Amino acid sequence: MPTLKDSGSLTPHYLAVFVAVLGFSLVAPFFPHYVMDLGASYTMLGFIVSVYGAVQLLTQIPIGRLSDQMGRKKILLLGLATFSVLPLFYIYANSADSLLFIRALGGLGASAVWPIAMALIIDQAKAENRGAAMGRYNAAFFSALALGPLIGGMLYDHLGLNAPFYLWAILGAASYLLVYLRINEPEKKSVMMGSLPSRGNEKLIAPGYYITFLACSSVVLWAGVVGGFNFTMLPSYAAGLGFNATDVGIIYLVYGGSTALFNIYFGRQADRGAKKRLIFTGCLLGALSFAALPLANGMITVTLLFAGLGMGLGMANPAAAALIADTTSASRRGEVYGIFNTARMSGVVIGPLIAGLTADLQGVEGSVRAFTLLAVAITVLTLSIRESNKAKYK
């Protein structure tokens, strides 16, 4: 079977990502209220949200390595199977403590989905098209993140708590079937570097690019932090301004839509060079947008700021992902993107913990200030990136 390299061949991959994200994002507008109705404090809420990422921190790298050895598709299918079963567990949960177990299982399933999906896409994208490929991946992810909360918020407001969870299970099953029927396991040669040394002698990161790898990973850590803030604190922040669950869904729509559109555009720009400039500018825009949130007092202002935040992520993320691919081993790509996604999930762990602890101590505005400081620190770190003129590993 020939290796597929055109963007059209990746359409089923992007569609599977879109459907999977659409499912789990349905509950975003009301999840904090759902958890706190079961007796959780803000701090407990932070732990419940964070355990999802914490499990991924522990499992993404070994699962990525396993996919390098056993094949990507079967691992991906196992992960997607959890997306169709676990949503039903939330309906019958009767305590906040039980959610820790459910979220932990969800994190294990997600470890078998996101890094493997990224590796499958990079396997089949030409070196000169990696920025565009990752831009489309992120666009699929964030366009679903834009629509899911709006749909979920409307279902919650009009049909009650259970409806979004049932739809999540249905969408998880649909993504599973799509991968099973439409996505093929890539040939081994499509993920190997021609006549390369064995894995034992092959460096994971090209010499001289370790700091660059760290800085690029910090970019997706920031994306995870933003996701953690949104999932933990956005509904409370919005409630303080008098917004309902549907309004929160609209904010997600603007944020996710902006992120998706700019991922496509700036993913193409990243393939033309200047990845470092895109990464720095995107992180700076995100920091400025976050810093202005305490000044917002209406729906229009809030949505504009979240659009700016989405634009910043859309500029920085595909460039960082492409630069990672350019400077790391192709034959160990599952492991590479396991590490890369572990950085993102570090943000998903850190974000809710910071949000919960600072909200209990200083309120929602205290959380926003803490997130702004973290965004500034990551922006400064991106100045250390060393740009590669050509892919070190194809």
Model-predicted segments: where are they?
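Juxtamembrane intracellular "pre-TM" segments in multi-pass secondary transporters
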Residues: 1-7, 184-216
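Core transmembrane helices of Major Facilitator Superfamily
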Residues: 24, 105-117, 308-320
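Paired small-residue
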Residues: 86, 97-105, 289, 300-308
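Cytoplasmic helix-loop-helix junction between adjacent transmembrane helices
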Residues: 102-141
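C-terminal membrane-cytosol helix-exit motif in multi-pass small-molecule transporters
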Residues: 170-192, 381-386
